């Protein structure tokens, strides 16, 4: 890389609401700034833009969330203008709709392009007739100079379902967490007390935390069905944004009442201080019924020295050590999930601490934010000198 000019990196993401992909984008932007790059982010906005402002990182508000073909087409020029005006050296895109715009903008400006595939891009789209169209729509992600995937599960899935020369440009970079941020020793008691008051939590019950946006495959219904079979006393908090899935959230609220769990399960909106939420809880559940590409909650929980219960599919198989840092159960097996929950509720403090220490070490050794950011930045550096 030339030393005479700070390299400008533009990350593009549909929105900056709560979520692992969004936080990862901000983490990399902050790491870039520390390493004398000029980071920028383009999105349709959201609550996490505050983090960018706080870090003095420039944000461009563009409707890159839209899948409307006209909007995608018009965004080509908008991204091209940013590239030219800000002298952007490399663009990193994390979703398909903005990737269509960014691909042509980068092609017109001869700018290096990186994509990150965060999911499997399910191919059973609407009906079998639309399958080829869905595959074409997805394939834009593989036209980048380097394609980053967040787990070996995703890499194997893509190589199995898509053909092309992109196999040589795929790089696995598992996501990471900021170890200090999720260090329970850094979370003050006042933050926890404030949160208990904010959520109006009972102090005489062990709290189960399920951090997940409200969408059907995250497993809210699976967890509720399992909770009806739990023998020990508990209180469960489901925290997350509905991301436009308001009908699904309403369905979950109704199910909680119908299953006589209104006094034991509470839904709260997404909020910023997740380390405090992890500290106040007894353990964490991530009951996805479809494979997670990676599953950031699993490593956040372990970094916070909390036991994690998750389903035995997707990225969880790469992040959780079964019966050492957490427990893995089959999707939809309500008996197994209820049994795992009861087992943790009955554990001694010594057993809980043993799992917590093992989880923290697992993340320190394999899933640190610094490692994830540095591996991503190394990809940028290689492309910028090629």
Q: Which stretches of residues belong to each language-model region?
A:
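A short, well-ordered alpha-helix in the C-terminal region of glycosyltransferases
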Residues: 197, 325, 343, 351-366, ...
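Short His-centered aromatic/hydrophobic patch
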Residues: 93-99, 117
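Acidic donor-binding loop of glycosyltransferase active sites
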Residues: 279-293, 306-307
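A conserved mid-protein helix/loop that constitutes part of the nucleotide-sugar donor-binding site
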Residues: 19-27, 206-229, 250, 335, ...
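Conserved acidic donor-binding segment of nucleotide-sugar-dependent glycosyltransferases
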Residues: 322-323, 327-335, 343-349
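Short hydrophobic beta-strand element within catalytic cores of glycosyltransferases
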Residues: 41, 307-310, 320
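Glycosyltransferase donor-sugar binding loop
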Residues: 42-47, 177, 211, 235-251
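A short, active-site helix/loop in glycosyltransferases that binds the activated sugar's phosphate group
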Residues: 144-169, 177-182
């Amino acid at each position: 890389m030339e030393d005479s000019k700070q390299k400008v990196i533009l990350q593009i993401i549909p929105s900056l609401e709560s979520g692992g992909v969004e936080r990862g984008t901000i983490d990399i932007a902050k790491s870039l700034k520390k390493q004398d790059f000029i980071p920028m982010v383009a999105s349709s906005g959201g609550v996490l833009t505050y983090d960018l402002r706080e870090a003095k990182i420039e944000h461009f508000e563009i409707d890159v969330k839209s899948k409307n073909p006209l909007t995608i087409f018009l965004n080509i020029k908008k991204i091209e203008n940013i590239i030219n005006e800000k002298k952007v050296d490399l663009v990193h895109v994390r979703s398909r709709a903005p990737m269509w715009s960014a691909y042509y903008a980068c092609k017109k400006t001869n700018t290096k392009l990186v994509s990150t595939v965060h999911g499997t891009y399910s191919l059973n789209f609407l009906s079998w007739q639309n399958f080829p169209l869905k595959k074409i729509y997805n394939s834009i992600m593989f036209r980048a100079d380097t394609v980053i995937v967040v787990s070996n599960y995703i890499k194997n899935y893509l190589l199995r379902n898509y053909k092309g020369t992109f196999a040589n440009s795929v790089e696995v970079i598992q996501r990471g967490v900021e170890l200090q941020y999720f260090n329970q020793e850094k979370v003050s008691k006042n933050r926890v007390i404030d949160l208990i008051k904010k959520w109006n939590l009972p102090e005489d019950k062990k709290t189960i935390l399920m951090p997940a946006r409200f969408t059907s495959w995250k497993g809210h219904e699976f967890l509720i069905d399992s909770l009806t079979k739990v023998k020990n006393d508990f209180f469960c908090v489901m925290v997350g944004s509905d991301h436009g899935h308001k009908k699904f959230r309403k369905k979950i609220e109704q199910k909680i009442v119908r299953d006589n769990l209104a006094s034991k399960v509470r839904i709260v909106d997404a909020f910023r201080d997740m380390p405090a939420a992890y500290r106040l809880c007894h353990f964490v559940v991530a009951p996805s019924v479809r494979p997670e590409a990676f599953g950031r909650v699993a490593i956040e929980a372990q970094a916070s020295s909390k036991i994690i219960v998750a389903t035995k599919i997707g990225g969880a198989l790469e992040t959780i050590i079964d019966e050492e840092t957490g427990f893995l159960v089959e999707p939809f097996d309500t008996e197994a999930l209820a049994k795992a929950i009861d087992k943790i509720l009955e554990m001694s403090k010594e057993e809980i601490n043993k799992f917590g220490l093992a989880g923290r070490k697992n993340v320190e050794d394999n899933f640190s934010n610094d490692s994830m950011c540095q591996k991503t930045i190394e990809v940028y550096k290689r492309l910028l000198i090629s």
